[in-house]
């Protein structure tokens, strides 16, 4: 169809976003269970984490709180080696991030040759897991592991290729026939039979909106707060000439580098002058600014962060005093961080007792972070849900004793007798 009026709109390109369904669908031949409608729900969570500054800050702050000052134990040296390449603190940090980001975590359990104990534990990225469909008893027998689930061609047949590893679920009673198993923690979530949901699942749309608000402001700047001008020419140019004029205008006036540029035209007669018509702004920038504040508050609420000052975000009307920040952080620790820690510690203790059966019951804790150098508890250790009463106090006393010894050694080095 001919363009009768030689009119062309200069459009900005926007990428289509596909939101994965939270429902779980099985493949046609029941070989594995898709993680979201398009089998890419973990990828969606990763994109939100990478593209929303508020959301990623919340996740990182909580993960830092979960990790704390690191793992501690009264049993010496057991935390030094989870596998030949990593210690338990390395594995613990990765598990903590997966737990917060996806709502669950997983690691590979490798038995020794005699199958009498666990020889090594390796973290497995939770986004790589796809569950085998439940058996008739409602139990998941194992998981397929791959980092290529997004390859639609590779998985277009709805079946798992033969080269994709499969690990049976952790069961020490089957160690003889299954030397490698997978330990998966997935808390109960209503309506979810196979995969967990992150605790911020109710804010997924709001987090996506945060990314779009930033995208609006970025494109407004890059496109010269467009469209602010309508330029009409009377040259009866052909399509190639119109495209050349459009490219020239974009290069000369679009973007922040060209702000305040001078518009200069040299024409052979006034009759050929273009018509330049200002387009009034609709006030969308103010609307998106207000929307951004609402989005920030909703994301903080989803992560159960009562005070944005914990993240370094200043809120109008709040004084931001030291005591207020400490109180808000302690509330976050007790209601959010501590439950994460206790769950992770329970899993780690179970593995350590399988690695060192001769040591009996093993107690592991996490030394909590301190916001300030003084004014808080000197040492606070969180232990697992399986820990006996008083074990946290014992670990705290040992840490304080070790710190005092380290301080004494430091003073002796500075002031030798």
Mark where each language-model region is.
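Structured, contiguous alpha/beta core segments that scaffold functional sites
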Residues: 1-59, 65, 69-267, 374-409, ...
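Generic structural signal for bulky hydrophobic/aromatic residues embedded
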Residues: 110, 301-303, 351
């Amino acid at each position: 169809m001919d363009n009768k009026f030689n009119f062309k709109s200069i459009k900005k390109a926007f990428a289509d976003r596909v939101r994965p369904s939270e429902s779980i669908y099985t493949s046609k031949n029941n070989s594995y269970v898709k993680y979201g409608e398009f089998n890419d729900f973990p990828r969606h969570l990763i994109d939100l984490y990478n593209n929303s500054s508020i959301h990623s800050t919340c996740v990182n702050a909580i993960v830092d709180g979960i990790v704390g000052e690191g793992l501690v134990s009264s049993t010496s040296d057991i935390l030094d080696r989870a596998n030949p390449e990593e210690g338990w603190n390395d594995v613990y940090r990765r598990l903590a991030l997966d737990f917060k980001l996806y709502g669950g975590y997983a690691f590979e359990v490798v038995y020794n040759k005699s199958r009498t104990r666990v020889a090594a534990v390796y973290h497995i990225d939770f986004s790589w897991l796809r569950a085998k469909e439940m058996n008739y008893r409602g139990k998941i027998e194992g998981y397929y592991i791959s980092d290529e689930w997004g390859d639609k061609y590779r998985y277009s047949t709805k079946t798992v290729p033969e080269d994709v590893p499969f690990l049976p679920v952790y069961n020490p009673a089957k160690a003889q026939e299954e030397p490698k198993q997978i330990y998966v923690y997935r808390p109960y979530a209503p309506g979810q039979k196979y995969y967990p949901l992150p605790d911020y699942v109710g804010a997924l749309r709001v987090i996506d909106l945060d990314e779009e608000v930033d995208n609006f402001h970025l494109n407004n700047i890059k496109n010269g707060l467009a469209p602010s001008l309508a330029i009409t020419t009377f040259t009866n140019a052909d399509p190639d000439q119109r495209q050349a004029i459009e490219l020239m205008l974009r290069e000369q006036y679009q973007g922040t580098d060209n702000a305040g540029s001078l518009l200069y035209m040299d024409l052979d007669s006034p009759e050929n002058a273009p018509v330049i018509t200002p387009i009034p702004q609709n006030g969308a920038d103010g609307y998106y600014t207000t929307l951004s504040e609402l989005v920030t508050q909703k994301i903080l609420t989803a992560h159960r962060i009562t005070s944005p000052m914990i993240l370094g975000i200043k809120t109008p009307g709040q004084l931001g005093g030291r005591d207020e920040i400490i109180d808000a952080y302690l509330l976050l620790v007790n209601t959010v961080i501590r439950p994460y820690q206790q769950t992770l510690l329970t899993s780690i203790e179970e593995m350590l007792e399988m690695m060192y059966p001769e040591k009996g019951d093993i107690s592991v804790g996490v030394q909590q972070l301190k916001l300030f150098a003084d004014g808080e508890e000197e040492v606070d250790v969180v232990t697992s849900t399986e820990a006996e009463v008083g074990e946290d106090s014992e670990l705290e006393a040992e840490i304080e004793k070790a710190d005092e010894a380290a301080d004494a050694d430091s003073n002796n080095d500075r002031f030798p007798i």
